[in-house]
């Protein structure tokens, strides 16, 4: 699926390993945690519909979100998980990250899931603000979560209203 926005940014889902190197390069620029190529392949090969990309008019990858569906440890219900989100610094503050997250949330909700989770560094104010503006809630502090020793917040988005 390909969607054009203002003829400048094109959104599409993952369709081929030909773009994997570009995804890895973009994610490695922004995220502090290193991932092996096997981690990327695990996500994109199992859930290609949950890997959304944004390209500029020249075809350059400028944004990506990589997600999966897994089981909640306590309830055994399926839930969405956002593993990676990155937008090229030159293209930030244009709504690209919001569009990528909202698109994936819509797909997860269509699959009947109750929630979507992710972790974000407590020092990553931009990410925390983005997710809060999209309706994610901080549900847990995870001390020393990252290899660098940085703490993280677990964030959750609930598709069904809390009662």
Residues covered by each model-derived region:
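Short glycine/proline-centered loop/turn elements that form peptide/ligand docking sites
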Residues: 97, 101, 124-127, 144-149
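Short amphipathic alpha-helical segments embedded in low-complexity Lys/Glu-rich regions
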Residues: 39-45, 59, 116-123, 145-147
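Conserved catalytic-core motifs of GNAT/GCN5-like acyltransferases
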Residues: 117-120, 132-154
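Short coil/turn segments at alpha/beta junctions that flank glycine-rich nucleotide-binding fingerprints
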Residues: 94, 111-114
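Active-site acidic-Proline motif in GNAT/NAT acetyltransferases
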Residues: 88-90, 94, 122-123
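Acetyl-CoA-dependent GNAT
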Residues: 3-90, 101-111, 158-162
């Amino acid at each position: 699926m390909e969607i054009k926005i203002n003829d400048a940014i094109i959104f599409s889902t993952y369709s081929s390993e030909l773009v994997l190197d570009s995804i890895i390069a973009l994610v490695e620029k922004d995220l502090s945690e290193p991932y092996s190529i096997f981690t990327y392949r695990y996500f994109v090969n199992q859930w290609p519909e949950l890997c959304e990309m944004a390209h500029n008019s020249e075809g350059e990858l400028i944004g990506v979100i990589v997600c999966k569906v897994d089981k909640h440890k306590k309830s055994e219900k399926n839930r969405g998980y956002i593993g990676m989100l990155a937008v090229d610094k030159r293209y930030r503050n244009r709504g690209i990250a919001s569009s990528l997250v909202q698109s994936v949330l819509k797909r997860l909700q269509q699959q009947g899931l109750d929630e979507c989770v992710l972790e974000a560094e407590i020092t990553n104010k931009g990410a925390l603000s983005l997710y809060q503006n999209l309706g994610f809630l901080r549900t847990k502090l995870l001390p020393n979560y990252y290899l660098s020793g940085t703490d993280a917040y677990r964030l959750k988005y609930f598709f069904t209203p809390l009662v």
